[in-house]
Amino acid sequence: RGVMEGLGYSCEHFGYDIHDIYYKPPVMNVEIHRSLFGEDGREFGAVFSDPWSMCTHDGMHYSFRPDEFFAYILAHAVKHLEEGGTGIRTIMDLWVCLHSDMKISAERSFELLEPSGRADIARTMAELAEVWFGGKAHSGETLRLEQYIFGSGTYGTVENSALNRIERSGKMGYFMRLIFPTFTHMKEHYPVLNRAPVLLPACWFARLVTKPFVNRRSNMEKLRVLMKK
């Protein structure tokens, strides 16, 4: 933190969740991750549990190997897609990677993602990139994905996120997760739980008291979808 602030960045987010966020006017936004994936995107946790082993390094400088790098880009894209949707820029990023001089083997990247159970949707996202920017013909899967993305805005929608979670966990499961998030999720937002797990009930209570006043519009949208569903 001291290094970043010494470089002129202001700290926007520190010590909880999976990353710290720094901002420097007019446009620089830097996320420093403690983990590549948290509770959201947990299906990729096993794939990227030891990211250092997926890298080449020169002294203290580590870089993902090309196929591992693209696998991570895909995983991050899928995570956002399933959280609530994603924008056109994400698909453009995939095309840029595939047509860069990195010599990426997309097939190997898909293979790396197989343990997550998300390799198929990752493949469809990469295929959509070729449809939009490479002139490839649509398949049924890419057309459905295109329609979903066009309805997602730049960063996805709360409604999409809620519907996706209800589909995975059921209505009651989603409701309980809203009220009582998992211990893993709570640790990301209440670091004290790393030292004192016994405080989980107290943190749940604190969250229930404060949550109605934070992101109020988002919370109301989640409840609206839950009641409608």
Where are these regions (language model features)?
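Conserved NTP-donor binding/palm subdomain of two-metal-ion nucleotidyltransferases/polymerases, i.e.
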Residues: 1-229
